[in-house]
């Protein structure tokens, strides 16, 4: 661990505007890249943080920069390009921030009169299409996604936007997450909110697996189920959800979106982020929906207040749903990711890090068929391998206490986030391993493999380097869960060192090779591997 007098290294260069690499550059390979590993590693994240004299406030606000590593027969090339969203083009043309983002309110056009600038406060805000969170797939096509109603369809070879898609033109939702789930046949599931006279609802969305016509996007999408928010004007914020073979699991957590503050944010001169608050006086609730019928199950499952961004996996066993989540006990971390905080150095940076809640993996068990005659105060979980409990209360609610899927050694790694599994074979199934980033800094500074059965860790770390979310790619035809490789983009603020694509053997968690590119890259969010 860091000693008491050793400050965290400054990472400001990882959170500054980068240049595009429009022409593919060949990487210098050290070690070896497996010959069978042929495809694209696609990643996205914020890559431009100012226009003219205007500066973004929050890390999440930066313009989407698309990254592509192409692997073919042991060689690797890299290129990148800013997503040509309407927001990016409007800001570029105006030479200023024209469209507001999560943590930055666009100021009125300085060329307008004082009266015009005042009146512009009362005009409805333009929703950003700066989709900088993840690559997602619908009907075989790839889209850039965030949490608004807009997605951008992209040509993954050229990194060019081909179409802008609005969820609200197809179904009655005001957005959708950047973390959909997929059935083996390609059917996609997602979640999005809707707002109406009766308050706010959380909607389960289903998108068909295939196109009926060549030009289709998300045609045929439908709302499978609508779940009323516990508080009409304060729905919960969520970033992902869980899915098993038969059920969708939604976690309604006490991070609240105050709709009135969000609606009036422009008038009040505040960004969207001002309307989000951590309210731990509320407990966390789990909602379970049958994927096949759209029926919301009657079980009322509650737990302590916590924040989760990413679910790890969920599966069914002995009449229960088991769901594993990365959890924080304090939900105020969103505000800490102001760029002025992330770019600090020395004691100031240390103080920001100390305020950040650490994220740890926890397992919850939700018994599905609870008899009205079930005894109060009794643990209803039959799972001998988990210490997670589900206890019926006097009011019929079921109180769920989690099992920690870690030992003290994970605390020394700063917790874990950006969890990934062998999704193609083990999503929605009982599994043994997941992979993530350790956080001894404000961004990931290690890669970790967790064995959820015995809670042991394997760790990869290189001092002064910061790895991205790990992506698991299975060996073709492999039977074992961890037979494959881990891909991660590893970057450094040290200008004399090269950034690189790291390839780890997933089983031993040792390095097979790396592909170095002398290109500046900002720290990003999510990505995916696409075989070719």
UniProtKB/Swiss-Prot annotation:
This enzyme's EC code(s): 1.13.11.-, 1.13.11.71
Cofactor binding: number and manner: Binds 1 Fe(2+) ion per subunit.
GO function terms (MF aspect): 9,10 (9', 10')-carotenoid-cleaving dioxygenase activity; beta,beta-carotene-9',10'-cleaving oxygenase activity; metal ion binding; oxidoreductase activity, acting on single donors with incorporation of molecular oxygen, incorporation of two atoms of oxygen
GO cellular component, one term: mitochondrion
UniProt superkingdom: Eukaryota
Effect of disrupting the coding gene: Homozygous knockout mice lacking Bcdo2 develop normally, and both females and males are fertile when raised on standard diet. On a diet supplemented with xanthophylls, knockout mice accumulate derivatives of these xanthophylls in all tested tissues and develop liver steatosis with large lipid droplets in hepatocytes and a significantly increased triacylglyceride content. Accumulated carotenoids impair mitochondrial respiration, induce ROS production and cellular signaling pathways related to oxidative stress.
Binding of Fe cation, residues: 179, 239, 310, 526
UniProt catalytic activity: all-trans-beta-carotene + O2 = beta-ionone + all-trans-10'-apo-beta-carotenal; 5-cis-lycopene + O2 = 5-cis-10'-apo-lycopenal + (3E,5E)-6,10-dimethylundeca-3,5,9-trien-2-one; 13-cis-lycopene + O2 = 13-cis-10'-apo-lycopenal + (3E,5E)-6,10-dimethylundeca-3,5,9-trien-2-one; lutein + O2 = (3R,6R)-hydroxy-alpha-ionone + (3R)-3-hydroxy-10'-apo-beta-carotenal
Expression sites by tissue: Expressed in small intestine, liver, kidney, testis and less abundantly in spleen, brain, lung, and heart.
Entry's localization field: Mitochondrion
GO biological process, one term: retinal metabolic process
Cofactor dependency: Fe(2+)
The protein's enzyme class: oxidoreductase
Keyword Lipid metabolism: yes
Induction of the gene: Up-regulated by carotenoids.
Alphabetic keyword roster: Dioxygenase, Iron, Lipid metabolism, Metal-binding, Mitochondrion, Oxidoreductase
Family indicated by similarity: Belongs to the carotenoid oxygenase family.
PANTHER family reported for this sequence: BETA-CAROTENE DIOXYGENASE (PTHR10543), CAROTENOID-CLEAVING DIOXYGENASE, MITOCHONDRIAL (PTHR10543:SF122)
Role of this protein: Broad specificity mitochondrial dioxygenase that mediates the asymmetric oxidative cleavage of carotenoids. Cleaves carotenes (pure hydrocarbon carotenoids) such as all-trans-beta-carotene and lycopene as well as xanthophylls (oxygenated carotenoids) such as zeaxanthin, lutein and beta-cryptoxanthin at both the 9,10 and the 9',10' carbon-carbon double bond. Through its function in carotenoids metabolism regulates oxidative stress and the production of important signaling molecules.
Listed name of the protein: Carotenoid-cleaving dioxygenase, mitochondrial
Organism from which the protein derives: Mus musculus
């Amino acid at each position: 661990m860091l000693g008491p007098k050793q400050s965290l290294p400054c990472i400001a260069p990882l959170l500054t505007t980068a240049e595009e690499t429009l022409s593919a550059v060949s990487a210098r390979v050290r070690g070896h890249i497996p010959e069978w590993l042929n495809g694209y590693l696609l990643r996205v994240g914020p890559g431009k943080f100012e226009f003219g004299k205007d500066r973004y406030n929050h890390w999440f606000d930066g313009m989407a920069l698309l990254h592509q590593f192409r692997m073919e027969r042991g060689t690797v090339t890299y290129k990148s390009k800013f997503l040509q969203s309407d927001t990016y083009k409007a800001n570029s043309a105006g030479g200023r921030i024209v469209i507001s983002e999560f943590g930055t309110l666009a100021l009125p056009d300085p060329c307008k009169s004082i009266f015009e600038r005042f009146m512009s406060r009362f005009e409805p805000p333009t929703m950003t299409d700066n989709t900088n969170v993840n690559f997602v797939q619908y009907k075989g096509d790839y889209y850039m996604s965030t949490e608004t109603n807009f997605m951008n369809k992209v040509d993954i070879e050229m990194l060019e936007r081909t179409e802008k898609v609005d969820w609200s033109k197809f179904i009655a939702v005001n957005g959708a997450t950047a973390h959909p789930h997929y059935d083996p046949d390609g059917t996609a599931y997602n979640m999005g909110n809707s707002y109406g006279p009766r308050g706010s609802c959380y909607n389960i969305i289903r998108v068909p697996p295939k196109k009926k016509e060549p030009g289709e996007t998300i045609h045929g999408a439908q709302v499978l189920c609508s779940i009323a928010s516990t508080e009409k004007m304060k729905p919960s914020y969520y970033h992902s959800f869980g899915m098993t073979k038969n059920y969708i699991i939604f976690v309604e957590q006490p991070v609240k979106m105050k709709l009135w503050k969000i609606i009036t944010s422009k008038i009040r001169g505040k960004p969207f982020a001002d309307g989000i608050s951590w309210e731990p006086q509320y407990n966390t609730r789990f909602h379970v929906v049958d994927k096949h019928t759209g029926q919301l199950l009657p079980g009322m499952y509650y737990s302590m207040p916590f924040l989760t961004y990413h679910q790890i996996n969920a599966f069914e066993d002995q009449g229960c749903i088991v769901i594993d989540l990365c959890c924080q006990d304090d939900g105020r971390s969103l505000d800490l990711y102001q760029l002025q905080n992330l770019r600090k150095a020395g004691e100031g940076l240390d103080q920001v890090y100390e305020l950040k809640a650490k994220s740890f993996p926890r397992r919850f068990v939700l018994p599905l068929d609870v008899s009205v005659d079930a005894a109060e105060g009794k643990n209803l979980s039959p799972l001998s391998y988990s210490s997670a409990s589900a206890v019926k209360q006097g009011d019929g609610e079921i109180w769920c206490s989690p099992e920690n899927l870690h030992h003290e050694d994970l605390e020394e790694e700063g917790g874990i986030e950006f969890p990934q599994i062998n999704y193609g074979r083990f999503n929605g199934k009982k599994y043994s391993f997941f992979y993530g980033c350790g956080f001894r800094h404000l961004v990931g500074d290690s890669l970790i493999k967790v064995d959820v059965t015995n809670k042991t860790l394997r760790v990869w770390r290189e001092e002064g380097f910061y790895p991205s979310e790990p992506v698991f790619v299975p060996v073709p035809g492999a039977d074992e869960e961890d037979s494959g490789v881990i891909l991660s983009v590893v970057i450094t603020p040290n200008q004399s060192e090269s950034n690189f694509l790291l390839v780890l053997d997933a089983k031993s968690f040792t390095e097979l090779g790396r592909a170095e590119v002398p290109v500046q890259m900002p720290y990003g969010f999510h990505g995916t591997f696409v075989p070719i």
